[in-house]
Curated annotation (Swiss-Prot):
Domain of life from the UniProt record: Eukaryota
Keywords: Cytoplasm, Phosphoprotein, Repeat, Ubl conjugation, Ubl conjugation pathway, WD repeat
Name listed for the protein in its UniProt record: F-box/WD repeat-containing protein 5
PTM comment, free text: Phosphorylated at Ser-151 by PLK4 during the G1/S transition, leading to inhibit its ability to ubiquitinate SASS6.
Function statement: Substrate recognition component of both SCF (SKP1-CUL1-F-box protein) and DCX (DDB1-CUL4-X-box) E3 ubiquitin-protein ligase complexes. Substrate-specific adapter of the DCX(FBXW5) E3 ubiquitin-protein ligase complex which mediates the polyubiquitination and subsequent degradation of TSC2. May also act as a negative regulator of MAP3K7/TAK1 signaling in the interleukin-1B (IL1B) signaling pathway.
Native source organism of the sequence: Mus musculus (Mouse)
Tissue: Widely expressed in adult and embryonal tissues.
A Gene Ontology molecular function term of the record: protein kinase binding
GO biological process: proteasome-mediated ubiquitin-dependent protein catabolic process; protein ubiquitination; regulation of centrosome duplication; regulation of mitotic nuclear division; SCF-dependent proteasomal ubiquitin-dependent protein catabolic process
Domain comment, as recorded: The F-box domain mediates interaction with components of SCF (SKP1-CUL1-F-box protein) complexes, while WD repeats mediate interaction with components of DCX (DDB1-CUL4-X-box) complexes. The D-box (destruction box) mediate the interaction with APC proteins, and acts as a recognition signal for degradation via the ubiquitin-proteasome pathway.
Keyword Repeat: yes
Record keyword 4Fe-4S present: no
Amino acid sequence: MDEGGLPLLPDSLVYQIFLSLGPADVLAAGLVCRQWQAVSRDEFLWKEQFYRYYQVARDVPRHPAATSWYEEFRRLYDMVPCVEVQTLKEHTDQVLHLSFSHSGYQFASCSKDCTVKIWNNDLTISLLHSADMRPYNWSYTQFSQFNQDDSLLLASGVFLGPHNSSSGEIAVISLDSFALLSRVRNKPYDVFGCWLTETSLISGNLHRIGDITSCSVLWLNNAFQDVESENVNVVKRLFKIQNLNASTIRTVMVADCSRFDSPDLLLDASDQAGLPCRVFDLGGDTEEEATDPGLHTSGSDHVKKGLRRVFDSVLDGHGQLSDCALETKVAELLAQGHTKPPECNDADTRNKYLIFTTGCLTYSPHQIGIKQILPHQMTTAGPVLGEGRGSDAFFDALDHVIDVHGHIIGMGLSPDNRYLYVNSRAWPPGSVVADPMQPPPIAEEIDLLVFDLKTMREVKRALRAHRAYTPNDECFFIFLDVSRDFVASGAEDRHGYIWDRHYNICLAKLRHEDVVNSVAFSPQEQELLLTASDDATIKAWRSPRIVRVLQAPRPRPRPRPRPFFSWFASHRR
């Protein structure tokens, strides 16, 4: 400005100069004078800075909740938990999983050292309790989850045994006394288990039917196993699902429809009644029907005709089927007459949906199964186990199946349970599975897919920044977590990653010394993130904004001012 206070440069010229500067230089220039300060806060200037700095596609609009481009730039720059503030070294082996309590006051960690540790989440994190599971013949702990009122902790682990053993167990721990309340068998161990209600949990069991055919049974268990009467259940069978081609059900979780932003159900039963299960195939442009619409109506005649065609073809030498392919074909045909179709139900936002990984072509989990849980199924009350078994419907049909054409290595729900985020390592385009025991090779890049559980559609392009290197038969789970604005995941490249959910951009890489297995946002404070690694550490990360607040010098308390009359009286001559 000149001496008279008038600007020497018009605002438009200052604006053009500021466009050529980076964000830090714009803010520094804004300290020179009032004119530059006003221009440095211009909305159009910060819109341009935002798209250029974060490399967001121009057709992506500003976040609906944002009030200005400047504040939105600041949110992504200053409020992402990317500053390491604490490293926890109490575990002595690889740390596999982290989970927060719903209040955010505590979190739990599982490790190859076979302990479940419970931590106090204060400004400085401290260890509250450590439960050693080796006396129960566990090899290691792998997963944990707090119940809704944070009074109980579900801990899942793997039994000691031969390398090919798939048995595990779920333990329920009281968070008041840290007493072990109950133990439930869980097979295969990577079902993990989950809470359905505050006092009931879901576990799995596996029954072999053939070499590559099996049946997964999902059980509802009471967390308190005291038996008051022989006529009262502590366990109840939820679903029985057929597995083909060496596949099994794994990674169960529950989505609560009542937490959706709108009252629409994930599955509108009034529209879907009578329709077969549908496969939403991400590898093609159309939806393909999973079953022939006439299968349920043709009954045993259809099954007999199908079996006769298969066997005649084999005997005549026309069908060159391997033993595995023949077993799968026969199992499919036999199941058609013994599978109960999905139950119809009036729209009810109290319903919950069981979500899990599965498959139909190979043992590699390449599909997401979704099964509606009706209100009457959410309790162990009902006929005592063994009663009411007269139906021919041996298996339960799924309500939805989503095929991702890749190996699923992680899943997580958004806080409102509407969006499902999936870590997947893709198969090569056009892959054909000829042998269920030899799935296609998987990509080193991990795709983070997003599905809207209201519409059963993929809603975002895949996020890709993190990597994994292990082959199919050694592939392990990479746990992810979702907060209000961010999604985070571990990776095998020794980093954790954070993306913005709206803009689909990677915001931070969080360094470890080995594979990052799990991440967890505080449910009450998304500017705090925990990461767990094979380097046997847990790291706590906070946003730059929170770090500044915590490190700011606290002013000394001033002497309490005396009232004017008291001050005046003491100074009278």
